[in-house]
A protein has these predicted regions:
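Glycoside hydrolase catalytic-domain context in secreted enzymes
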Residues: 25-701, 707, 712-724
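N-terminal secretory signal peptides that target proteins for export/translocation
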Residues: 1-6
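Bacterial N-terminal signal peptides
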Residues: 12-21
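Short beta-strand elements
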Residues: 725-735
């Protein structure tokens, strides 16, 4: 979503508007509650049937009102219907005389965004990238259900979360909002999130369609990519997410793809999304991402946000003049109506309630514990032993006050005044306090970490030194490099030189380089951990929770190893020019299919930590591998089985990963993720696991036949604990 500067309304204006709100809202509610004969309120009818029935009763103006927003705080001057908004990202007028409610929208990447300015506070979950490290569809469902519930509690019935752009560009400032670099993992997790969001009777959203893989020049950039490459990478994540979650809306992105802006790109919106995938919901523009009226409507854009520059009076005039057929406008409006019925917002009107703060915090902490990745544990320095630990040095990262969060439209404000759109915000969840509570008898030292020499002196005094290091990222900007900011690499080097038992806890929105990795004993990746992150980290440091998370992205050794070693930027004179008629610079994604680990595999580049990597306080073994093709009736279905055993002394949960190497004739990267299983095991316990591999996950996009196909030949299947730790393998021929 676009950069939003949340402005304050002058007190006099606010009072005047408030006096207008009460009678207007009363009238609106009275109209909405009037119940003449409305056959479309029969819930036994399908959403399509109900939408068609309503559409036949609507006037031209009512149809136009459904296909654009009515504004949001801080975006232009107040509009005539501004008082009907809920203070969120925007809203769409309903049709009160027909019982169709308004759509009240809020950003909700990792919690309900539009809260603090209205005196409401939301649960801040760990970032989406963090939750992806759980590799757990059930955790994704829990995540979505909480957001859906809190949206309704605060008066919203549509979420603007559901980001699933792949980590094609690791320096992307919004990677923390997304689900990692693999389309099957990302699509599966976002689909489960959306499914459980919508189960709470809100309209789910998946975004940013498509290839909005960096923030730099996002309004001006044209992405150049082959049909096959985008179908098998970025678009596949959307396709899987839509097939699982059935979102009511797809948000088109700011950038252009192969020459046309995404929100007026017929190939993306109609040919692929609506035709090939059969998407029945509506396409909503990213905020300010609409560029035209006739072209955008013909391409398949259904709803302009947050205002009506192109889909208000201009669209009405185009319909009346015949430039836009009435049938086209009807399709836009029908899709909005269908999503309202399918999501249940018509039959289950929003009723505001007090947010269950304690319940939300418990969910946030649970997901944070499942999402924190143990990257290094030399000499089993972790978990820390309470009995022998007499002193601890806590250094850096504002660990005395909180843990950092991601910025932009995703930002969930903690209690207190609302923050600027791009601001460093620390949730008041203090690692220092959480760790002190674990060992109340130990001596605690704290140093802010602003001076490496001073921090080193503090570290010398303690049995163990824990450095909290952060990398703040935000919508609207990318990080210039993957190194830690604010001289933190030097800080860690100094502390590690002073204390041989140095542990680093990372709070980051994407991968970071670690020039100090050989000099520290332990590393935890906590990501943006939400408003109970400190408790989760403390539980893992002291072994109350056994880490089980694994990386959903690759951590490279350096920026030089990336497909694009230097971030592609627009020329300075072409930056931030607002809505354009055409893009002004290109990014050629010539790495094509080789996104994330597939790039490093294909190019034989060593990495710092591979995709799928994550340590535990216990150990696991894999054995008895078997792979078999399906029956004669379904020969492309493959079943993989193996035995997983917990060979350590602690209970734990292992994420077992299955990869496939396709025949050389397929022209694919060396291997791809095709399945996984998360299994909880007691010490010494074994379990036989069997995974059925979806043939779609073994397919390639064939441009000649315009479809997916399984290439005949020999397939190698591999199983293990990460993309570079695959002790089991077997082959099978597919025809």
């Amino acid at each position: 979503m676009s950069g939003r500067s949340w402005t304050r309304v002058m007190l006099g204006t606010a009072v005047a508007l408030f006096l207008l709100v009460l009678p207007a809202l009363a009238q609106h509610n009275q109209l909405e509650n009037t119940a003449p004969n409305r056959p479309w309120m029969n819930t036994s009818l399908s959403p399509d049937q109900r939408a068609d029935m309503v559409l036949k009763q609507m006037t031209l103006d009512e149809k136009i009102n459904l296909v654009h927003g009515e504004g949001m705080p801080g975006w232009g001057p107040p509009r005539p219907n501004w008082y009907l908004g809920n203070g969120g990202a925007g809203f769409v007028l309903g049709v009160p005389r027909l019982g169709i409610p308004m759509i009240q929208m809020s950003d909700a990447a990792y919690g309900v965004r539009a809260s603090a300015q209205n005196g409401r506070y939301s649960t801040a979950l760990p970032s989406n990238l963090a939750s992806a490290a759980s590799w757990d569809p059930n955790a994704a469902c829990e995540y979505g259900a909480l957001i859906g519930t809190e949206l309704r509690d605060q008066g919203y019935n549509m979420t603007l979360g559901g980001g699933v752009n792949l980590t094609r560009e690791p320096r992307n400032g919004r990677n923390f909002e997304y689900m990692g670099e693999d389309p099957i993992l990302a699509g599966t997790l976002v689909g489960n999130r959306i499914m459980c969001e919508q189960a709470q009777h809100v309209i789910g959203d998946i975004k940013h369609y498509a290839l909005n893989d960096q923030e730099s020049g996002r309004n001006e950039v044209n992405v150049i990519i082959s049909e096959r490459a985008m179908r098998e990478t970025d678009l596949l994540a959307f396709q899987i997410g839509i097939s699982i979650g059935h979102p009511g809306a797809v948000m088109c992105s700011y950038n252009a793809v192969n020459g046309d802006f995404a929100c007026e790109n017929k190939h993306l919106l109609t040919d692929i999304l609506k035709h090939d995938w059969g998407f029945p919901g509506f396409v909503v523009s990213d905020w300010g991402g609409t560029h035209s009226t006739v072209k955008a409507s013909a391409a398949g854009l259904d709803n302009e946000e947050p205002l009506d520059e192109f889909f208000g009076a201009k669209l009405k005039e185009a319909v009346q003049s015949g430039q836009v057929p009435m049938s086209q406008l009807d399709d836009h409006a029908r899709r909005v109506l269908r999503s309202e019925f399918a999501s249940g917002i018509v039959d289950h009107p929003v009723e505001k309630a007090v947010v269950d703060v304690e319940g939300g915090f418990a969910t946030s902490q649970d997901i944070a514990e499942q999402s924190t990745v143990l990257l290094k544990n030399a000499g089993n320095v972790l978990p820390l032993d309470r009995a022998t630990l007499h002193s601890i040095a806590i250094i850096g990262g504002h660990a005395d006050s909180g843990m950092i969060s991601g910025g932009g439209s995703a930002q969930v404000d903690p209690p207190g005044p609302p923050h600027e759109w791009q601001a460093h915000v620390w949730f008041p969840t203090s690692p220092l306090k959480a760790i002190t509570a674990k060992v109340p008898g130990a001596v605690m030292y704290f140093d802010r970490g602003t001076d490496p020499a001073s921090a080193a002196e503090v570290a010398k005094k303690a049995d163990v030194a824990i450095v909290f290091a952060y990398q703040w990222t935000s919508e609207g900007m990318d990080v210039p490099a993957l190194s830690l900011p604010d001289n933190q690499d030097a800080l860690i080097e100094a502390v590690a030189a002073a204390n041989p038992k140095t542990i680093v806890v990372l709070e980051t929105g994407t991968a970071v380089t670690m020039p100090w990795i050989d000099n520290v004993r332990g590393v935890l990746e906590a990501w943006f951990a939400g408003n109970k992150g400190a408790s989760a980290v403390a539980n893992i440091l002291f072994g109350d929770v056994n880490p089980s998370a694994k990386l959903p992205i690759t951590f490279p050794r350096s920026d030089a190893d990336l497909p694009h070693p230097t971030l592609v930027m627009p020329p300075p004179e072409q930056r931030d020019r607002g809505v354009l008629t055409r893009p002004t610079f290109n990014i050629n994604y010539d790495e094509g299919l080789k996104v994330g680990y597939k790039w490093y595999d294909a190019e034989n580049k060593p990495v710092l930590f591979p995709f799928g990597f994550g340590l535990s306080y216990t150990t696991y073994s894999y054995s008895d591998f078997n792979v078999s093709a399906g029956s004669p009736d379904n020969p492309e279905v493959v079943t993989v089985s193996f035995v997983l055993k917990n060979t350590g002394s602690r209970a734990g949960a292992e994420i077992s990963e299955v990869y496939a190497a396709l025949p050389a004739s397929a022209g694919e990267p060396p291997k791809r993720l095709v399945g996984w299983s998360k299994t909880a095991l007691k010490p010494g316990e074994s379990r036989s696991l069997s995974l059925t591999i979806d043939p779609k996950f073994l397919s390639i996009w064939d441009e000649g036949s315009h479809g997916w196909k399984v290439v005949p030949g020999r397939y190698t299947f591999m199983a293990g604990g990460s993309s570079q730790d695959l002790p089991l393998s077997g082959k099978v021929d597919l025809q």
